[in-house]
C-alpha cells in the first residue's frame, strides 16, 4: 500500500483531517505493541506480540534483534489489517522503546553482529569498575552525561561487542558498523536503511552523550574505544525520522515522534513542567520528575536525563530519574521460576488474602540494586521465612517490595530537588493492581493518581508524533485530553508505616556489598 505525498509539518486543515489516527509502536523488554490512537487520545485498538528472553549466563540478558523486529513489525501489520486501515487513515507513527539496550549491525547488510545486549545485563560490571577506578573519570562521566557509571547504560555494552565479537572492531574502524538503541534499529528497518538516527532522550541514556552541549562526547567515545562513525544522528523527540519504506509495510507514513519509554510516559502523563512526576510500573520501575531547563544534580544516586519536549520548545528540558531493575520482572519470576502464580492478575487476590507478609521481605536484587544504592554485585534475597510462611505471604512481599523501592526513590528525589511531591502520577501494567497502589500510597504517605488510560508510554509517543504533524495543535489541547481515573490516599497509621520501612531498610542492608 502507498499513500499520497505529505509533509511532516505545516499541514493545512484539510491535510490535518486526512489521517484519522496516530500509531504508537511500543517496543518493550518482553513484548512489542502497536497501539492506535484517535484524536481524543483514546486507544482504539492494540496488538501485542511477546518475544523470547535469552539468558546465556547468570546476570547476562540478551534479545535476538530479529525477534524484536518480527514482533514489532508483525504487531504493526496485524493492527493495520485487523482494523482495515488504508494508508491515509494513519497520520503518523511515534516510537517508544526499552532504553539502553544495545544493537550493533552491519550498514551494508543490515545484519546484527550479535544479539542485543539488554539494559538489565550486568556482563560489563568489571569493565566499568576498571575504567572508572580513577575517581576523576567517574566524575567526568557524571558531569557530562548526568549518569552514574554503570553497566546499565549503553557505552560499556558497545565496547564489549567490539572487544568480543570476532571482526567487530576492525569493521567498526572501517565505518561498516552502526550502533543504535532499539529506536534506531526500528527506524533503520522501517525506513529501509535510509535513516540512522535516534532522539535526545535515548541518546541521553548511552553514557556517551553530552546532555549540556547536545552532542556525542569525544572524550567518552575515546574512553570506551568507540568510533564516532558508529553513532546515530541525534534529533529532537518531536521531529522527522523519515517515513516507512520497507517492502511489505504500508509505504510513506511519517515517523515523527521518538522517545525512550520512561520519557514517553512522562510526556503521556502531561508532566510538562518542573516538579511534575510520574512512576511507571513496567518490567522495571521508573520514577521521573520534570526539572524544567535545569539539569539537577543528585547526591543520592539518581541520574539526570533529558525529557522529551514538544515542537518549538526552546532549549533542552531535563528530568531527574530513579530506576528499579526488577518490578514486573519480579512478578514474572514468581510465575515462571517459582510457579506461585499462573498470571500477574492473581497477585492482587493472593496479597489481599493475608493481613500482612508475616514478616517476610523480598529484596529483588537479581541483577543488582539500582538507585539510590547502585550496587551491581548485590543479589536477591528473601528474609523472614518461617514454617508458617505460605504462597500468599511471598506474593504479597513481592508486591510490597515494588512499593518500598519506589519509596526509596521518592525520598531521594525530594531531597535532591528540594521539591516535596504531594502527588505521584502512576502508569504501566502493574498499576492496574489496586493492592499495589494502595500499599504504595500507604507507605509513601502521598496521593497516587492513576489515569483511566494507563498506556501512557504509547500515548506519549503518539502525542509527540501528532504534535509534530499538527494532528494535535499544542500542549494545551493535549492537557484537555488528560483524565484521572482513580485516586489512592494513605490509610496506614504512621507508627505501622515506620515499622515496615525500618524492616525494609534492614533487609536491603543485608544484601548490599557496598556500604554507605
Show the residue positions of the predicted features:
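Short, conserved phosphate/pyrophosphate- and ester-handling motifs at nucleotide-, phospho-/glycolipid
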Residues: 64, 121, 261
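N-terminal glycine/serine-rich phosphate-binding loop of ATP-dependent small-molecule kinases
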Residues: 3-114, 143, 233, 249-257, ...
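Short linear loop/turn motifs
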Residues: 231-240, 348-352
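A structural motif corresponding to the C-terminal end of an alpha-helix
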Residues: 223-230
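Active-site core segments that coordinate phosphate-bearing ligands/cofactors
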Residues: 23-25, 39, 125, 132-196, ...
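Residues that line or immediately flank small-molecule/substrate-binding pockets and catalytic motifs
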Residues: 51, 97, 120, 238, ...
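Short beta-strand-loop/turn "lid" adjacent to the catalytic site in phosphate-handling enzymes
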Residues: 81-119, 145-154, 187-210, 235, ...
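Short secondary-structure junction motifs
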Residues: 31, 87-90, 229, 357, ...
Amino acid at each position: 500500500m502507498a499513500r499520497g505525498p505529505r509533509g511532516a509539518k505545516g499541514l493545512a486543515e484539510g491535510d490535518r483531517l486526512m489521517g484519522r489516527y496516530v500509531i504508537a509502536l511500543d517496543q518493550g523488554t518482553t513484548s512489542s505493541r502497536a497501539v492506535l490512537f484517535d484524536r481524543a487520545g483514546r486507544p482504539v485498538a492494540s496488538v501485542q506480540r511477546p518475544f523470547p528472553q535469552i539468558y546465556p549466563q547468570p546476570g547476562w540478558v540478551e534479545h535476538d534483534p530479529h525477534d524484536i523486529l518480527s514482533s514489532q513489525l508483525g504487531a504493526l501489520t496485524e493492527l493495520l489489517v485487523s482494523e482495515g486501515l488504508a494508508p491515509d487513515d494513519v497520520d503518523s507513527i511515534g516510537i517508544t522503546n526499552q532504553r539502553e539496550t544495545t544493537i550493533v549491525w552491519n550498514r551494508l547488510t543490515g545484519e546484527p553482529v550479535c544479539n542485543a545486549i539488554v539494559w538489565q545485563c550486568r556482563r560489563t560490571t568489571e569493565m566499568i569498575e576498571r575504567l572508572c577506578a580513577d575517581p576523576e573519570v567517574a566524575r567526568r562521566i557524571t558531569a557530562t552525561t548526568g549518569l552514574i557509571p554503570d553497566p546499565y547504560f549503553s557505552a560499556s555494552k558497545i565496547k564489549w561487542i567490539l572487544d568480543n565479537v570476532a571482526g567487530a572492531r576492525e569493521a567498526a574502524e572501517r565505518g561498516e558498523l552502526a550502533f543504535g538503541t532499539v529506536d534506531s534499529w526500528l527506524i533503520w528497518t522501517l525506513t529501509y536503511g535510509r535513516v540512522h538516527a535516534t532522539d535526545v532522550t535515548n541518546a541521553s541514556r548511552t553514557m556517551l552523550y553530552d546532555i549540556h552541549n547536545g552532542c556525542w562526547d569525544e572524550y567518552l567515545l575515546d574512553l570506551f574505544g568507540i568510533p564516532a562513525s558508529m553513532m546515530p544522528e541525534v534529533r529532537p523527540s518531536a521531529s522527522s525520522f523519515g517515513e516507512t519504506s520497507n517492502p511489505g509495510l504500508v509505504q510513506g507514513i511519517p515517523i515523527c515522534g521518538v522517545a525512550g519509554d520512561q520519557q514517553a510516559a512522562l510526556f503521556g502523563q502531561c508532566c510538562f513542567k518542573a516538579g511534575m512526576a510520574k512512576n511507571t510500573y513496567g518490567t522495571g520501575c521508573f520514577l521521573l520528575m520534570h526539572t524544567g531547563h535545569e539539569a539537577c544534580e543528585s547526591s543520592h544516586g539518581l541520574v539526570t536525563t533529558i525529557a522529551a519536549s514538544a515542537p518549538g520548545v526552546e532549549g533542552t528540558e531535563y528530568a531527574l530519574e530513579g530506576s528499579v531493575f526488577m518490578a514486573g520482572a519480579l512478578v514474572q519470576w514468581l510465575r515462571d521460576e517459582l510457579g506461585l502464580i499462573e498470571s500477574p492478575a492473581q497477585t492482587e487476590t493472593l496479597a489481599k488474602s493475608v493481613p500482612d507478609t508475616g514478616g517476610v521481605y523480598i529484596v529483588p536484587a537479581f541483577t543488582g540494586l539500582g538507585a539510590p544504592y547502585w550496587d551491581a554485585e548485590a543479589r536477591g534475597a528473601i528474609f523472614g521465612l518461617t514454617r508458617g510462611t505460605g504462597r500468599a505471604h511471598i506474593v504479597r512481599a513481592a508486591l510490597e517490595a515494588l512499593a518500598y523501592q519506589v519509596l526509596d526513590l521518592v525520598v531521594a528525589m525530594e531531597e535532591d530537588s528540594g521539591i516535596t511531591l504531594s502527588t505521584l502520577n502512576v502508569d504501566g501494567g502493574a498499576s492496574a493492581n489496586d493492592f499495589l497502589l494502595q500499599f504504595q500510597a500507604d507507605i509513601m504517605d502521598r496521593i497516587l493518581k492513576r489515569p483511566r488510560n494507563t498506556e501512557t508510554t504509547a500515548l506519549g509517543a503518539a502525542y509527540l508524533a501528532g504534535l509534530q504533524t499538527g494532528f494535535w495543535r499544542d500542549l494545551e489541547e493535549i492537557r484537555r485530553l488528560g483524565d484521572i481515573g482513580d485516586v489512592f490516599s494513605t490509610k496506614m497509621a504512621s507508627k505501622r508505616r515506620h515499622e515496615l520501612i525500618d524492616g525494609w531498610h534492614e533487609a536491603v542492608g543485608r544484601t548490599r556489598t557496598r556500604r554507605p
